Amino acid sequence: MSSADIARRAGGITERSVRYRLERLVSSGIIRVSAVADPKALGYPVLADVFIEVEPGQIMTVARTMTEFECVTYVACSTGASDLSIQIVAPDNAGLYRFVTEVVANVAGVRKTTTVLLPLVLKDVYQWTIPKSTCTD
């Protein structure tokens, strides 16, 4: 959406003000402007979360290893039943299965994996908006 469109939708603000505010938000690191590819459109319609239990002392090593795989879209350290959470995309269920059982399971330090297919995503991270209760001007 252009700065002019934002100014029109907001009402009472100039395009120049919108550009200035956006530049401030970007330069301060509050927002990032980036393109997000649609995995389905690129031939990766299968999406899954994989929860990983890791050997003690190996969490960061395994986490860093997971970031190196192209089909892994998200890596996070977690608490609770699993130590890591990753999200992966695959061309089909067989590809997902192979990646989890032949790649993830064989990474040094991985103790156990639990895979959850995500057939429908209603809201993705790039759709998050700042809660009105925390907005200040």
Give names to the regions the model predicted.
Residues 1-137:
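A compositional/biophysical signature of low hydrophobicity enriched in polar/charged and small residues
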